[in-house]
């Protein structure tokens, strides 16, 4: 049987001026996804994808690096300004927003879309260290 050669599709350079940055910041990781206004992903990055492991993955510095990486990739597609939606209680929320601004993207709005339960699931037990 003939072996199939791995052919990767060439990335098409999109020309997108405005977009949305979705920052998901949990206690363990921070994921930054940059999309166009319709929600189609342009670029993404996370602290874990950059090689941070364990407790270092949840630091503000790791979130900053993830946001910078995602911003650089999105700026190659022509992204200039964006709205930011932040979800979750993690440490990397503010650091990720600051990193997006420092990368040269204009932040027009910041929206907190953290889901708040109307007394849904029982929370995890308190930690005793």
UniProtKB/Swiss-Prot annotation:
<dbReference type="InterPro" id="IPR019981">
    <property type="entry name" value="Ribosomal_uS11_bac-type"/>
</dbReference>
<dbReference type="GO" id="GO:0005840">
    <property type="term" value="C:ribosome"/>
</dbReference>
<dbReference type="InterPro" id="IPR036967">
    <property type="entry name" value="Ribosomal_uS11_sf"/>
</dbReference>
<dbReference type="GO" id="GO:0019843">
    <property type="term" value="F:rRNA binding"/>
</dbReference>
<comment type="function">
    <text>Located on the platform of the 30S subunit, it bridges several disparate RNA helices of the 16S rRNA. Forms part of the Shine-Dalgarno cleft in the 70S ribosome.</text>
</comment>
<dbReference type="GO" id="GO:0006412">
    <property type="term" value="P:translation"/>
</dbReference>
<comment type="subunit">
    <text>Part of the 30S ribosomal subunit. Interacts with proteins S7 and S18. Binds to IF-3.</text>
</comment>
<keyword id="KW-0699">rRNA-binding</keyword>
<dbReference type="Pfam" id="PF00411">
    <property type="entry name" value="Ribosomal_S11"/>
</dbReference>
<keyword id="KW-0687">Ribonucleoprotein</keyword>
<comment type="similarity">
    <text>Belongs to the universal ribosomal protein uS11 family.</text>
</comment>
<keyword id="KW-0689">Ribosomal protein</keyword>
<dbReference type="InterPro" id="IPR001971">
    <property type="entry name" value="Ribosomal_uS11"/>
</dbReference>
<protein>
    <recommendedName>
        <fullName>Small ribosomal subunit protein uS11</fullName>
    </recommendedName>
</protein>
<keyword id="KW-0694">RNA-binding</keyword>
<dbReference type="InterPro" id="IPR018102">
    <property type="entry name" value="Ribosomal_uS11_CS"/>
</dbReference>
<dbReference type="GO" id="GO:1990904">
    <property type="term" value="C:ribonucleoprotein complex"/>
</dbReference>
<dbReference type="GO" id="GO:0003735">
    <property type="term" value="F:structural constituent of ribosome"/>
</dbReference>
